[in-house]
């Protein structure tokens, strides 16, 4: 150190000397100049020389000094410091401290270390990154129709007319021109009245509003009984009083569906006996030998005799209504003359048949279906069949009837030789002779249960050979397909696919001729019932010939592609096309492209000529012979069910011998007898003609011998021979009851587009609406928050209006009604009704409802029951205290969806495979589903399906598909901008966005199309994972930028990741990466490439059917979800694990999970893992932490708010859930908490799981409330300890509710009007006291806290669809977590015992997907003219 100091001093001395030298040089130069002793040049030269020397000397010294200083510094570091350290270590230091001082130092040190560990390392859970809350989906109504009423002139006139003629379906250009060529218009002034005659034609209101009145004498039996309140709705016209039926506005037709059918079929003639019988006003029930109507069906069944007394239905068939119209305002009516419809029938018979089928379909949807399901007018509907059979006195000749009965009995007796049960249905089928045979076998499997729990089976025989000695006993039963299903299934079976059947035949040509005669007689008998005979067809032919020189294929049969053929060839070509359909492996049979497009091809050439001889040749024999090939003769034993209610009608039955009874089961599960069918009558007429599900059961009261004509044969016959179809439609118009005519005339068929408002909030309630097709949503504007994100006001500079705060009141699908309450109470609309997608509705005007209520009180009762049921549901669903959900509250309307669009996020997702698996899931849960993709639609409709002309045909086809199936899957397997993708989205009630969870959560091209289309349908996201594991925060990254997604699902499915995806990820990482994480990038890239070429085992895959993700998704989408609700109760909730194990052992699937307190913890683990093993381990670890006395003791704090800080409890929960969000749980999950800041219950479905589960478990006093956005949250059990109502609102149909709460002490108290504390203490400690212990302050406060929860629990026990379970855990206390195994075993034992008893008692609910559900047979889509 001393040497270093000396060297530094010498350096400084040298520097100072150099500076002094330079200074003296400057001074000398200045003096020389001042004294002028030298010249200036000399002075300057001398100065420069001296300055150069001085500078050189200074630099040398500086360089030398720096080098010396650096060398000495190295020496100090290498030698000086070690020497000093060694010297310091060699010294002896003595420190003297007292023990108390040392102890204080150690305590301080430990305190610092503990504080650092406690508040920095053990509180990671409290420092999780705060996420901005996701903007919840809002309800948007993209309606641009507010200013439509302002349109005037020709544009509005033409639009309204086109809107009205949509009722005809698709019209080709020649047909449209023919209809509108002679169109007329009427101008009506306000209050002007004119009679509306059917002969005038088809009328449309194109401007203004018109009121329709019906003659009161034909509508109300006693005109004087009209109350004064209805006088204002009635008028006097030509001396008659008329009652208001409806009010028609612009764009709606004035002509009813019935009148439209009459316009097309007026020139057709029916069987003369048909007209005379139907038009006879004296026809009564007593005159009808083949029909009977009983007022008390149960008595008739007991007596076993048909009744012919006075019927309770109107016997008089339909007659033309006397209707007049009055213009409420200045109005314009457009009329298409009746003559135009007659010309259409002659020139375009195939197009006419198509239009008539469309009208019949809408007549069935609007009038029949509404009358059956809504008004309860099933008896009036079946009065149609009563009127039809009233003239059917054409029984078979005795020898034919006796021969058929004898042969069927022989076959039946032969079948009994095998020792089989005695309940059979035997069918005699004609023998197929070689390849030239034109007959195919239609087998109708009727596998039903009779009144005596007997099964009805059908034996199909392909020949009519006599039963001889060559037949061995049991041959028949060992070779025929005997089905044991419990419900009838209609199946078209081709010859090449039929099962091997032992044939019984009647040998000899005489027997075959007799069989042919029998079938021919049966066909003629059915034709006569339908009004068809040789004379009526011949007269129609002559009428056409005399009225038109243009030949028509109306009677000779339409050909396909220029070739002619029989009905059998048509059926064979149709079946062959079905077998070749590419979508057949999906389990859906679609008609072939040829069979579908043949109609359109024929329609375009319907004006082609046929030679005159074909017109003169009567085709009756051809039609009869073709139909006879498909006529079966069947035997049904007593109590067999021929047609089941709500099942497709298999065909038309003509009764040869025996008695058939018709009855139906109403909404209250009460069976009603309607009438009986005697020999000579027909059954299944309405379902066969209209092609819809049956409204009633058709059962054999005795052994029944009948002729059976399959519905498919009727449909193909109607297509091949349009005249037959038109004649059947005319016969239907002749037998309708008067009440159905009034319904048809007053009810309006309304078609709305997606986003269109049907009515607005605050408008006067003038009608009830029933959804026929599509989906609508009821939306109300609520007061309060404006809904503007960021707090900006609605008065923006861009002039946009303030966004309304809308709330979804409900969604209504097919068959549901809306608006009854306002119509009955004469109040204004409380909400706005908007169409989610293109929809068809039936509008029931208030005037019609009031008029019907006067004459038919049963209608009033039905509507009153509906309204009362809805009011009761609203009252039951109303929460006792306000509640708030942290998500978009549309789950309450999560019913069964009819149409579901499967749309990928991007083209990299294999949506076809997903759609196929979802279709299989729908079938596994018992849904009748149809899978449509681009290929199947093109194969069915042809390559022009998506052209502007083909879209109308496609729309009709899709409507027909949606009417036949419970669920229709639209798979968007085409590019985003394609027509099929747009069709899938526009047709959907629910859109499933399918995404690969491994890809980047960017907005895909399909989503842009979805947003651009502005669809209002519910949108749900499906994240596909290769393993049953979701990384924390992944779901939130997908949902946050997608405000249009309402909810999400996690599904496990293998999706191969292509090399292009990996390279895209590499390029993205190159753009955004830095050198710091290069190693991680390389490792990630290596792992990506390995995953492409290396098979990877699924760590959480399961083969259990009850855990199949696609079955779960199918149950949720079809409204059949299974929910599990776990209640709170402290340590007693460990029994939840045992019950979950019992549920899994029983094969019960779980789709939704909800819980309170400890139930939220166990339920959250199950929803996250969806596996019992990790739940058991994590729950046991948590119980060990909570039961640790040391942990609880260290967590104690001053009891200002609670006894503990909550830290140990928080860590126990966080150890189980980590930083997972509720959205990351595999199953949909919710938990409830009590918000003591705003005094309400809150439902949590998103956010950090541990926080809201901890809040739901926060027992007041033991744990402090958890703060969330400024609110304090406590245990949800204070409000609802078993949140069953919320689970039902989420969409669960069956809920397993497990209650582990403490039992309420309801011991009666009687201690007088005053109470002494000393007496309470004495009574509590006195072992001989007779009074019950009086609760202390803490117990009273606890009872007050659980008051609302007790009421909610009692309500949950009696909620329909809830299976209440309470294990025997009353011996365990709330904090007995140390008894984990004991409590678990109690729950497991109780769960197995409870479920076993539930099965034995027959109370086990039907759970779809739990086992192999017996689904209906796959039905093919029979092509209809309505397509």
UniProtKB/Swiss-Prot annotation:
Task: Provide GO CC annotations from the record.
Answer: endoplasmic reticulum; endoplasmic reticulum membrane
Cited CDD domains = CAP_ED
Reaction(s) catalysed by this chain, per the record, are: a 1-acyl-sn-glycero-3-phosphocholine + H2O = sn-glycerol 3-phosphocholine + a fatty acid + H(+)
Where is the short sequence motif DGA/G located?
A: 1275-1277
Record domain PNPLA: where: 1124-1288
State where the protein is found. Endoplasmic reticulum membrane
Motif GXSXG in this chain: where?
1155-1159
- Its biological purpose: Intracellular phospholipase B that catalyzes the double deacylation of phosphatidylcholine (PC) to glycerophosphocholine (GroPCho). Plays an important role in membrane lipid homeostasis. Responsible for the rapid PC turnover in response to inositol, elevated temperatures, or when choline is present in the growth medium.
Listed name of the protein? Lysophospholipase NTE1
Q: What is the lineage of its organism?
A: Eukaryota, Fungi, Dikarya, Ascomycota, Saccharomycotina
Query: Which gene is transcribed and translated to give this protein?
Result: NTE1
